[in-house]
Structures are given as C-alpha cells and as structure tokens.
Curated annotation (Swiss-Prot):
Protein name: DNA repair protein RecO
Keyword line: DNA damage, DNA recombination, DNA repair
Described function: Involved in DNA repair and RecF pathway recombination.
Superkingdom of this protein's organism: Bacteria
GO cellular component labels: bacterial nucleoid
The keyword Heme is annotated on this UniProt entry: no
Designated gene of the protein: recO
Subunit structure: Monomer.
C-alpha cells in the first residue's frame, strides 16, 4: 500500500534496539502489522507520533504478513485521554487487536472507532455509553446481526414489560424465567436505539455485549478489562436524573 491513508496505532512493542513492531488500524486496509525501522532511535522524528490515539497519515510497503512503514505524520496531537478514559481507550484498542483479522477492510468501523475515541476525549461523565455503542457497532461490522425489535419466536414487536431470553445466533425469545441471559423489552429497545438513559439499561447493554463478544474473544481474558475493573470506581454512571 504505497498511498497515504489514515490510521491509528493500536499497540506497539520494541522489535530491535532501534525499531518498533506496530499493530495499526487503517481506514483502507484494516488492521496491519508494521515494522517501523529506526523509530526507537534518539534522532527519530517518529517516536512521538507513533502513539495510541494519535491520528496519523502513513504509507507502508511489503508483501508479507509484516509490512515496512515508509512514512508517518501526525495529523494532530493525540486525543486527550486520561484516567478512566485512557483505560477505556486501551480496552477498545485491545478489542480490535483480538477480533479483527489482518488486512480486512473496515472503513466504516474506522470512523466508529474515531467517533468513540473523540467521545471518550470529550466526556465529563461515564465512558460506558461510548463503549457500549462502539461494541454494538463492532458486532454489526463483524456480521453479528441481531433483531432487537421483534421476538424471534412470535415475530411480534417486543413489549416493554415482557422478558426475553437471548439465544446465540437466533435472537430473543419470550421467557417466564428471569436470569442473567434475559432482558426486558425496554432493554432491547434501548439496545436498538443505542441510547442508554439510566443505569439499568446501561448494565443490560453491557451484559449483552459481553455475551455477544465472547465467541470472538475465546477464553483468554482481556488485559485492559482487568485494569479497567481495578481503576473503575464503584459508581461512575450518572443518569439523566442526577
């Protein structure tokens, strides 16, 4: 890919005394693995640019699994994430690194990622709504289509007061039993609208995305999720009534 394209660094690690191995998410090529030669040297002007959450323009070349970074420029300063929003950003970076195949184009997902990072940088409240919206967008781009508005058993529209059980790859079915795999019709409508007006709907959204992402993540836990759990205060979510 000789042309310039927009990108973000998801993760980097030392590759040699002077080079970095980068996992980047690009607009045109999706996730790409790059070697940034000389990026660790004291004279390199890339060192400050090749950081997570910094909007980049870059060019690379190569035919193998690992490409060679040719040029990179920071479009702007890194989006200002700190504290809980920084952990949230690290979480979505790790999520993309775990679920996306290399060199598969996800142009719309790239903009969902950018919107999520910008929302995290601009929030003064809980990062949870932005995270849930991004997870739902990611599931959609992965082909995980779910009908939140109709009962999979009867075909009727969901009722706010009824309870529905989620069955993987099948949808939501009316249920008389309430447990961790069930959701109210109100929850499902909130998921469909990507709007979470209170703690209850936000928790329901988190339960659903955890369930839906599990097949993609396998049994290996996310490192960033554990860090997030340790950092997250017991109550960070503010409802519209607060």
């Amino acid at each position: 890919m000789e042309g310039w394209q927009r990108a973000f660094v998801l993760h980097s690690r030392p590759w040699s005394e002077t080079s970095l191995m980068l996992d980047v998410f690009t607009e045109e090529s999706g996730r790409v693995r790059l070697v940034a030669k000389g990026a660790r040297s004291k004279r390199s002007n890339l060192k400050g640019a090749l950081q997570p959450f910094t909007p980049l323009l870059l060019r690379y070349s190569g035919r193998g699994e690992v490409k060679t970074l040719r040029s990179a420029e920071a479009v702007s300063l890194a989006l200002p994430l700190s504290g809980i929003t920084l952990y949230s950003g690290l979480y979505i970076n790790e999520l993309l690194s775990r679920v996306l195949e290399y060199e598969t184009r996800f142009s719309e997902l790239f903009f969902d990622y950018l919107n999520c990072i910008q929302a995290l940088a601009g929030t003064t409240g809980s990062p949870e709504p932005a995270l849930r919206r991004f997870e739902l967008a990611l599931l959609g781009h992965l082909g995980y289509g779910v009908n939140f508005t109709h009962c999979a058993g009867s075909g009727e529209r969901v009722d706010d007061t009824m309870t529905y059980r989620y069955r993987e790859e099948k949808g939501f079915f009316a249920s008389v039993v309430i447990d961790n795999n069930t959701f109210t019709g109100r929850h499902l409508k909130a998921l469909d609208a990507r709007e979470f007006p209170d703690v209850d709907t936000l928790r329901a959204a988190k339960r659903f995305t955890r369930m839906a992402l599990k097949p993609y993540l396998g049994g290996k836990p996310l490192k960033s999720r554990e860090l997030f759990r340790q950092f997250m205060p017991k109550r960070t979510v503010k409802t519209k009534k607060d």
